[in-house]
């Protein structure tokens, strides 16, 4: 009976790991081999050591998971930690740890990100940005969310990386090009006493095609569509700014319990890659109030792509004008967005909080 139940659980898709604790006898090993083969066919990890299983349980209980845990070669471990120089930077309160990784020193950004972004035991931040070599731009940016997952695109982070490059003479002129998300972004710099104090980036095309957002809903686009999330009805507009966004216009932004509603949106089944959920109110035709619950981060003080998404949705629905600056007010400050022919332009102030060295 127990053998049948084990196979039924494996077939149900509810099992992520199999831990074998049976005796090493011929009859039990044959049963394990058969179970092991079936589990592997369903892409289920099989563990044969209680120590390994306990270590995995500790990992799953912590903020680490199978996507951001570093595999270490025990035969070739480093004898000492190396030093990573970083800059802690912010744009309207969304803060990133910016690291020059042109030498390829960071081997597992996902694991580094989880520890470094912890606001109690690390530097603290909404994510990390690695600056790397590029053949097609001044530099390449790879951004990771606080949980170690790849961020894809981040508008505020682009502005901060541009400031980092200019202020350290890693790029010259009044414009910086950054390779990010498979595209090259152009960032115009505004200087005070030779340092970048604000910047403007062409965020590129606003994408509404569901397959490219992605969102698993029918139709050529999802605009002002009524859907059910957490047993409540919401009118949503889904789009991509290089990462997936879902925008909902509400009467009272401050009244929302984002710690409850946010995860329901982020992990809804219609979003195969999760989603950044924006909750907006149009104050007037040139001002939007916005809160964003980011995938992998939770609610943040600001979100550049989220501001672009909210402005684009407002223009799409005729709530705000095209080709005009729209002030997007977020908990951490203001961002300026302009939508022109389904392209988004983001402007924001940039600042460095401090520099330091991480033991890595």
Task: Name every feature range the model reports, one short phrase each.
Residues 1-5:
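Conserved small/polar residues in nucleotide/adenosyl-binding loops
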Residues 7-81:
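Peripheral docking tails and interdomain loops at the edges
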Residues 21-26, 92, 146, 206, ...:
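Short glycine-rich anion-binding loops that position phosphate/pyrophosphate groups of nucleotides
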Residues 30-31, 57-61, 190, 212-214, ...:
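Short acidic, glycine/serine/threonine-rich loops at helix termini
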Residues 81-195, 246-360:
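A glycine-rich beta-to-alpha transition motif near the start of alpha/beta enzyme domains, typified by
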Residues 81-105, 201, 213, 218-239:
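N-terminal, positively charged, Ser/Thr/Ala/Gly-biased leader segments
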Residues 194, 198-206:
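Membrane helix-loop-helix hairpins that form the core translocation module of multi-pass transporters
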Residues 236, 244-247:
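Selected transmembrane alpha-helices and immediately adjacent juxtamembrane segments
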């Amino acid at each position: 009976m127990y053998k049948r139940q084990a196979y039924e659980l494996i077939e149900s898709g509810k099992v992520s790991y199999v831990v074998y604790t049976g005796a090493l006898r011929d009859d039990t090993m044959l049963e394990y081999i058969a179970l092991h083969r079936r589990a592997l066919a369903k892409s289920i990890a099989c563990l044969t050591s209680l120590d390994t299983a306990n270590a995995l349980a500790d990992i799953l209980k912590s903020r680490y998971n199978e996507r951001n845990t570093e595999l270490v070669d025990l035969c070739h471990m480093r004898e000492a930690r190396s030093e990573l120089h970083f800059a802690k930077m912010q744009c309207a309160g969304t803060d990133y740890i910016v690291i020059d990784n042109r030498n390829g020193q960071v081997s597992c950004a996902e694991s580094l990100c989880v520890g470094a972004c912890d606001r109690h035991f690390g530097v603290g931040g909404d994510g990390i940005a690695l600056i790397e070599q590029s053949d097609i731009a001044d530099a390449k940016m790879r951004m990771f969310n606080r949980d170690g997952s790849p961020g894809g695109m981040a508008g505020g982070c682009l502005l901060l990386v541009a400031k980092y490059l200019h202020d350290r003479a890693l790029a010259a002129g009044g414009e910086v090009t950054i390779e990010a998300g498979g595209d090259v972004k152009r960032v115009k710099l505004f200087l005070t006493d030779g340092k970048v104090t604000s910047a403007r980036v062409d965020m590129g095309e606003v994408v509404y095609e569901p397959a490219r957002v992605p969102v698993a809903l029918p139709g050529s686009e999802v605009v002002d569509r009524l859907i059910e999330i957490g047993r409540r009805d919401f009118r949503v507009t889904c789009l991509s700014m290089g990462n997936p966004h879902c925008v909902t216009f509400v009467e009272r932004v401050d009244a929302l319990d984002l710690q409850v509603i946010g995860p329901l949106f982020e992990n809804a089944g219609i979003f195969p890659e999760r989603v950044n959920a924006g909750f907006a109110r149009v104050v007037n035709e040139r001002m939007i109030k916005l809160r964003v619950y980011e995938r992998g981060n939770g609610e943040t003080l600001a979100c550049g792509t989220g501001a672009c998404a909210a402005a684009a949705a407002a223009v799409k629905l005729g709530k705000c004008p095209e080709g005009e600056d729209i002030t997007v007010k977020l908990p951490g400050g203001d961002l300026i967005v302009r939508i022109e022919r389904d392209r988004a332009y983001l402007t924001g102030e940039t600042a460095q909080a401090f520099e330091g060295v991480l033991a890595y």
